[in-house]
């Protein structure tokens, strides 16, 4: 029989790996954004996005821009593809994080 604790840690590891993939894709998206749309890059604080002095309100703007698919009207196909990838990874990572939290609650009740 599979240990529930081992299953939880495996799920947690998959979630962390997907988070790393998401942040890597987001960084690549910002590089593409800097080249194809400098105004949007500054609007979402692309230069300070992953720094300690980054502005969370501007970072949230990029998240909502991608989540609501406002990039579909953009002129650059590479940017659209990157946004689609980041959006899919965001949804996957959010679902996995939710599953990890539910699993943790289940483990606390079970054990």
Swiss-Prot record:
Record's keyword annotation contains Secreted: no
Membrane topology: Multi-pass membrane protein
Record-level GO cellular component terms: plasma membrane
ATP-binding among keywords: no
Parts of the chain that traverse the membrane: 1-21, 90-110
Disulfide feature: none
Localization per record: Cell inner membrane
Keywords assigned: Cell inner membrane, Cell membrane, Membrane, Transmembrane, Transmembrane helix
Residues of the signal peptide: none
Cross-referenced HAMAP family: UspB
Family: Belongs to the universal stress protein B family.
Record protein name field: Universal stress protein B
Native source species: Cronobacter sakazakii (strain ATCC BAA-894) (Enterobacter sakazakii)
């Amino acid at each position: 029989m599979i240990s529930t604790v081992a299953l939880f840690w495996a799920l947690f590891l998959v979630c962390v790996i997907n988070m790393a993939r998401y942040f890597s894709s987001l960084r690549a998206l910002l590089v593409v954004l800097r080249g194809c749309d400098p105004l949007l890059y500054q609007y979402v604080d692309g230069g300070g996005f992953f720094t300690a002095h980054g502005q969370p309100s501007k970072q949230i703007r990029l998240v909502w821009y991608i989540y609501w698919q406002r990039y579909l009207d953009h002129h650059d196909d590479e940017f659209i593809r990157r946004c689609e990838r980041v959006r899919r990874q965001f949804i996957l990572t959010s679902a996995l994080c939710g599953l990890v939290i539910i699993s943790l609650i289940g483990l606390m009740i079970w054990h």
